[in-house]
C-alpha cells in the first residue's frame, strides 16, 4: 500500500500547528489518521474533536499497525517513535515531505515551482525579500514554511511559485524534496543537540541544493563546500565581492547578476533596508533565486527599494541622547550575533540565553574591537563571560543574575572587568525585570554614537516565551527608560 493511498494508516506525531495541518491534509485523501502527542491535555482536546488518539508509549508498541509516520519538525530522529518506525521499515515524513508529494501528485493543480531558502541565519529576511521580488515580477506566489503558515495549508491557494523557508529540522524529514531552486545562505553551529553533529546538521541543510538550481553563499566556507558538492545541474554562488562567472556579487556598490545574465545590474546596495553586509548577502541570495525563475531585474530593484525589515531583526527601537537602540532578538546563535554586531562600529552588546551547545569564542574574537560594553543575561551568560575574559578582557561587563537562575551561575575566569547585579523581580514579571535591568546597565555603558544592541546569541526560553517576547520586553524597557 502506498503511504498516502485511501485507507492508509498514518500516525501523526505532534498536536501543534503542523500536526493540525497534517490532519487537515490527510482527511480528504481517505487516510486513517491517528494523533499522538506528549501532552495528555492536547490528546484529550483532540479526542473531543473526534480525532483518533494514542499516547506515545502505546504508539511505539503499535508502530507496526501504521503505513506512514508524519512527524512535526521539532521531533528528533532519536525520539522513540521515529526510532521504532525506522526499525520496522515504516517511512517517516515531515509535513514538508507530505506537501511535496501532494503537490507533485497534481491534486492541487499543476505542480508549483518551489524556491527554498535555508541557512543558520537570514532565512526569514531572505525568503521575505524573495517573495517581494516574485510579487513585483507579477508572479502568483505564496510565502510559507518555517516563516509562518505550513506549506500543507497553502497548497489550495492559487499560485505558480512557493517561496519556502525551511529549517534544518524540516529538511531532515523531507528526503524527496527537489526544489526548482534552493539556497543555503550560511552554516554555523546551531541545533547540534538535535542533529547530533555538525556534519549531520550541514547534511540536512544541503537537501535544499538537490533540485535544478543550487545557490550557496561563497563567503561562508561550509555553504560554499555544500554548493560545490551539490548534485544540482546549475550551481550559483553569491558573494560580497566582485562576482565571477556563474555568480552574484557586488561591484561599485551595485548588486550584479553574472549567472543568469552577463554583468546585469540589479539594484544599488545602499537601497537595501537591512543594516550591514548581512543585508546585502540576503538580497543577493533572494535575487539569485528570483532570477532562477526569470524575474526581471527591474522587479528585483523595486522589491528591495520598498522592502520592510521584519520585527526583531535589526529593528531600530529608538534613538535618544545620540544612542541607537536596536532589537535583533532573532539573533539566537553566535553566528547571527556576530553578523549583527559587525553591522555597527561601537556596540554595547546585550547577550545571553540558551546557547544550545554552541561556542561563542569565534564570535567574540571577531567582534571584540567593536564592543564598548557587554550586558549578560540568561542561563548561559557565564559561557559568554568566559569567552570575553579570553578574547576581550578590557571590555567592561555587567552580569545580571536573578533568584530564578542564580543556581546555574558558574565560577568566572579572571580578567574581565565585571560587575554582578542581582535582579529583584518584585511585582514585575521575570522578563520585565531582566530587560529593565539590562537596558539600565547598557545605558550606563553607552555614550553618544554608540548602539545598544540586543543580539543575544542564544535562545530565549530560559527567561522569555520566545525571541519575540524577548524583543518586545527590550523595546518596552527602552521606551520606559528614555521617556
UniProtKB/Swiss-Prot annotation:
Gene3D superfamilies, alphabetized: Mur ligase, C-terminal domain, Mur-like, catalytic domain, NAD(P)-binding Rossmann-like Domain
Known catalytic reactions: UDP-N-acetyl-alpha-D-muramoyl-L-alanine + D-glutamate + ATP = UDP-N-acetyl-alpha-D-muramoyl-L-alanyl-D-glutamate + ADP + phosphate + H(+)
Cellular localisation: Cytoplasm
GO molecular function, one term: UDP-N-acetylmuramoylalanine-D-glutamate ligase activity
GO cellular component, one term: cytoplasm
Alphabetically ordered keywords of this record: ATP-binding, Cell cycle, Cell division, Cell shape, Cell wall biogenesis/degradation, Cytoplasm, Ligase, Nucleotide-binding, Peptidoglycan synthesis
Pfam families (alphabetical): Mur_ligase_C (PF02875), Mur_ligase_M (PF08245), MurD-like_N (PF21799)
Intrachain disulfide bonds: none
Enzyme class, first EC level, given as a word: ligase
Domain of life: Bacteria
Chain positions recorded as ATP binding sites: 119-125
Annotated InterPro entries: Mur-like_cat_sf (IPR036565), Mur_ligase_C (IPR004101), Mur_ligase_C_dom_sf (IPR036615), Mur_ligase_cen (IPR013221), MurD (IPR005762)
Enzyme Commission no: 6.3.2.9
Transmembrane parts of this sequence: none
Entry's Gene Ontology BP terms: cell division; cell wall organization; peptidoglycan biosynthetic process; regulation of cell shape
Pathway membership, UniProt: Cell wall biogenesis; peptidoglycan biosynthesis
PANTHER family per record: UDP-N-ACETYLMURAMOYLALANINE--D-GLUTAMATE LIGASE (PTHR43692:SF1)
Function of the protein: Cell wall formation. Catalyzes the addition of glutamate to the nucleotide precursor UDP-N-acetylmuramoyl-L-alanine (UMA).
Family the entry assigns: Belongs to the MurCDEF family.
NCBIfam families attached to this UniProt entry: murD
Name of the featured protein: UDP-N-acetylmuramoylalanine--D-glutamate ligase
Organism: Mycolicibacterium vanbaalenii (strain DSM 7251 / JCM 13017 / BCRC 16820 / KCTC 9966 / NRRL B-24157 / PYR-1) (Mycobacterium vanbaalenii)
Lineage of the species this protein comes from: Bacteria, Bacillati, Actinomycetota, Actinomycetes, Mycobacteriales
Amino acid at each position: 500500500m502506498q503511504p498516502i493511498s485511501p485507507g492508509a494508516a498514518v500516525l501523526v506525531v505532534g498536536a501543534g500547528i503542523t500536526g493540525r495541518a497534517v490532519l487537515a491534509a490527510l482527511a480528504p485523501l481517505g487516510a486513517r489518521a491517528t494523533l499522538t502527542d506528549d501532552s495528555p491535555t492536547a490528546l484529550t482536546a483532540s479526542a473531543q474533536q473526534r480525532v483518533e488518539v494514542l499516547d506515545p508509549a502505546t504508539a511505539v508498541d503499535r508502530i507496526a499497525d501504521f503505513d506512514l509516520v508524519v512527524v512535526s519538525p521539532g521531533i528528533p530522529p532519536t525520539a522513540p517513535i521515529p526510532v521504532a518506525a525506522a526499525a520496522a521499515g515504516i517511512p517517516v515524513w515531515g509535513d514538508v515531505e507530505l506537501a511535496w508529494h501532494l503537490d507533485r501528485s497534481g491534486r492541487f493543480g499543476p505542480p508549483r515551482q518551489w524556491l527554498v531558502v535555508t541557512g543558520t541565519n537570514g532565512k526569514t529576511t531572505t525568503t521575505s525579500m524573495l517573495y517581494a521580488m516574485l510579487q513585483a515580477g507579477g508572479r502568483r506566489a505564496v510565502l510559507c514554511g518555517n516563516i509562518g503558515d505550513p506549506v500543507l495549508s497553502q497548497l489550495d491557494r492559487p499560485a505558480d511559485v512557493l517561496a519556502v523557508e525551511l529549517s534544518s529540522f524540516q529538511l531532515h524529514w523531507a528526503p524527496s524534496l527537489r526544489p526548482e531552486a534552493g539556497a543555503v545562505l550560511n552554516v554555523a553551529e546551531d541545533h547540534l543537540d538535535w542533529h547530533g553533529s555538525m556534519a549531520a546538521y550541514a547534511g540536512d541543510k544541503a537537501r535544499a541544493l538537490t533540485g535544478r538550481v543550487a545557490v550557496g553563499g561563497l563567503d561562508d566556507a561550509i555553504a560554499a563546500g555544500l554548493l560545490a558538492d551539490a548534485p544540482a545541474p546549475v550551481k550559483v554562488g553569491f558573494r560580497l565581492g566582485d562576482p565571477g562567472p556563474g555568480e552574484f556579487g557586488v561591484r561599485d556598490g551595485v548588486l550584479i547578476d553574472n549567472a543568469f545574465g552577463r554583468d546585469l545590474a540589479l539594484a544599488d546596495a545602499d537601497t537595501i533596508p537591512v543594516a550591514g553586509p548581512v543585508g546585502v548577502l540576503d538580497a543577493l541570495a533572494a535575487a539569485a533565486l528570483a532570477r532562477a525563475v526569470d524575474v526581471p531585474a527591474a522587479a528585483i530593484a523595486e522589491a528591495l527599494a520598498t522592502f520592510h525589515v521584519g520585527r526583531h531583526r535589526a529593528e531600530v527601537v529608538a534613538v535618544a541622547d545620540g544612542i541607537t537602540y536596536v532589537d535583533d532578538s532573532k539573533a539566537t546563535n553566535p553566528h547571527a550575533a556576530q553578523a549583527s554586531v559587525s553591522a555597527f562600529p561601537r556596540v554595547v552588546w546585550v547577550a545571553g540565553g540558551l546557547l544550545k551547545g554552541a561556542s561563542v569564542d569565534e564570535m567574540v574574537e571577531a567582534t571584540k574591537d567593536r564592543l564598548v560594553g557587554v550586558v549578560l543575561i540568561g542561563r548561559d551568560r557565564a559561557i559568554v563571560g568566559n569567552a570575553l575574559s579570553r578574547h576581550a578582557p578590557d571590555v567592561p561587563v555587567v552580569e545580571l543574575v536573578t533568584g530564578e537562575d542564580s543556581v546555574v551561575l558558574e565560577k568566572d575566569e579572571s580578567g574581565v572587568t565585571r560587575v554582578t547585579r542581582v535582579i529583584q523581580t518584585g511585582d514585575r514579571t521575570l522578563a520585565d525585570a531582566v530587560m529593565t535591568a539590562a537596558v539600565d546597565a547598557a545605558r550606563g555603558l553607552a555614550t553618544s554614537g554608540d548602539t545598544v544592541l540586543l543580539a543575544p546569541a542564544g535562545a530565549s526560553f530560559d527567561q522569555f516565551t520566545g525571541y519575540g517576547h524577548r524583543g518586545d520586553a527590550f523595546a518596552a524597557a527602552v521606551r520606559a527608560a528614555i521617556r
